[in-house]
């Protein structure tokens, strides 16, 4: 009885090795008989390949020299030419008449675990030809009575888990006369692919062996034989099949080979069979690789490479402050010293960790000041104009009488007060005297930071160390390279194994907050690949590409020598896809009108029709958030739409100004003087009361000390700049939403099958044509729909909501459940709250995030000319709870309700065999439009490549399968751009116009987002060359090629002149 334990590949290998040992012993015993020519044999119709005098009921005997000690393997190679010529020269024996049918013989199969296979079902006597005809296959092109050569017989293996792990061995030959001919569709004839060398196996084994399967689990090698392992199901039973793959034509002719094999070329040396010969290309590539490595190593050893992984160190302070360096050099807190990052700092009346309040590039938030000790000794940091300044003050007595601050002609000098100077943490209205400028204005970090003045008092003590420089050296003149510190600046924070680096320190690698520094050639080559275009980049590309080319050459030659090129091609390139013959074919059809496919008859989607009953639901006008503003290089006196008419657009400014719950703010940036008149900081206190005494305005006036005023460049340092922003929720006259209800919806797909038109629906998904029956997997109908026709600024867009709303449940406040007017005059929802305006600097880390609900961010933009600055406005989503808003419509609707998420599945039943390939080339011209992570499908369209169906994936996510040609589908995107699209092989990048969930809202939410136009732009030659480096490179290459061509022409003319008129 057969064992019930499942067979494994290890058991298969052991069975093959045991059988090979038995055959080697059998061949060694009969080696002398194999060398003698055999007499002609009579063909027996019942055995179809066995000797006439052999007992078919006994154990099977393998034919052919398959021992490991033989030089030739006749089981898969033709006889030598001399033997073939000798056999042709002999007179063929007369062919006897066909013998009458004989009783069937037991099959020549055995189990892998020593058990016996079940006896086959009894049936009519068959030979290979009759068995092929009985299976419905056409007869071969050659004479079926011709004796098949014994070396044509090969062995394949078959086992099933449902058969109790019975392991079958099937003996067959690929053809009866040499290489089989190709069928009309370019595949091998199935009648010639399976002709058993013995009686017909059991019927269920034959069905399992002939079951089409296009997937391969693995490629296996046994000696010089190659097998393909497949896993499939037949009638609910899982089968495993190990197919022998043909290597070359059996008769030695030059007939075409199957698609999954390649020509075998001998690459072994006659003297050393194990060696593989290489030619000049391999030697050249190896030399090129060594040269690139040598040059890259030499360049890496000249100077250390630094991998910048963090923002660079703050720029140095101006040279004008260096004169104070000698006074307080020993008291300066530098980066990396104790008590800086890990110390406890005093902020107002509280003590906080330094990491919580330390301002600078290293923490997000606004700038501020902190104290290292008590209030008698204050140390402060200020950031202005992209530079950091340290200000130290020692033992300042309390102020006696405050004295207004007198401003000098520029920011580098200041007047000295007449009384005793006050400490830095005096009141806001107190003045500080005796300070030397250089710190400038600042902004607070915390609300409790009220004891720090708006101006930092104290001496400007900016430390000026020499810049850090490295060098590379060797120990005793031998590798490896070491990094030596020539000069070190403490604030750079370079450390070696956790210890701060000093001049003279030697270390394999230095680490700092800015990145890593090393002299290693390997690290230098790696850094060269990541840097911008340079010679190191080219060398790194050669070093990375050439080894793979050499590896490919080595594997290709080695695999061709071993006869496994078919397996390597199958695994690496496209997978082994045997011919799939059957009565059913399944493919996909995209859902855009005009899509076509082959199944195998041409099928085209002529159109899609949507049928429903429509009920009008009225019209309404939604709220809309609008914002505008201006960047002005002075302080305006009339802050209104009329007073700022030269800077702000008139139409949106008037609409926002007349709206309800508007937010209007004017920020004064670094305003110290205007028109030559001195002004105090209190002139722009929060609320702007002092400013409004002289300039009446309806907007809030806020100071913006510490923000960069570089947008208005071309001024002395005592200039001012103001930013004006205006935002509110308004009812736009050109934005309306009309509601329509659709019931009893149904989608009708109009197909053209080989010229025959038919319509399919969910009730009737079949098409009966003269070529066969087509069954379509139609997606379900969407059901009841709600259509929102959104008109805005002359453009119309329809959004669809699935299902009927539950007006007595959670959808009670939705626009569908409201009573709308036919003329769109009703404004839906309550009046929203006023938006919040915020001035954000251009280098603020806050810009890396998105604005919050109901927030509007304004940022000055530097112009290309003096006195010209712009404004960039960003707005977040709606900041109120009302759901009658455009973003509610986008979140609860879709752009196309009846558009299915995937393609149509087509199952075509026909009488002729069909084979459907699969495309591997990347799709072309793919465009992605919509949003991601928003619950609404995005539109994906492009061109599928030829060669079969394209199983499209976007960033690794399966979208569907499409035939060659144009496709249009909808997919839920979970990742942001860029998007890599692929059909299963090579990938390509798609163009995308998508928005994130925060930006998904009614079109035209922010009417700001504009920049004040600049009359002209200027560009230097260096900037132009940097922007057109690729064209310049190609032009230089073409110029060199043209110069070489002209030189060749000149040389030819020179020799031609000498030939015509020799001297």
UniProtKB/Swiss-Prot annotation:
Residue ranges crossing the lipid bilayer per the database entry: 535-555, 1029-1049
Annotated InterPro entries: Rubella_Capsid, Rubella_Capsid_sf, Rubella_E1, Rubella_E1_1, Rubella_E1_2, Rubella_E1_3, Rubella_E2
Record's protein name: Structural polyprotein
Phosphoserine: residues bearing it: 46
Taxonomic classification: Viruses, Riboviria, Orthornavirae, Kitrinoviricota, Alsuviricetes
UniProt keywords, alphabetically: Calcium, Capsid protein, Clathrin-mediated endocytosis of virus by host, Disulfide bond, Fusion of virus membrane with host endosomal membrane, Fusion of virus membrane with host membrane, Glycoprotein, Host cytoplasm, Host Golgi apparatus, Host membrane, Host mitochondrion, Host-virus interaction, Lipoprotein, Membrane, Metal-binding, Palmitate, Phosphoprotein, RNA-binding, T=4 icosahedral capsid protein, Transmembrane, Transmembrane helix, Viral attachment to host cell, Viral envelope protein, Viral penetration into host cytoplasm, Virion, Virus endocytosis by host, Virus entry into host cell
GO BP terms, alphabetized: clathrin-dependent endocytosis of virus by host cell; fusion of virus membrane with host endosome membrane; virion attachment to host cell
Organism, scientific name: Rubella virus (strain BRD1) (RUBV)
Segments in the Cytoplasmic topological domain: 556-582
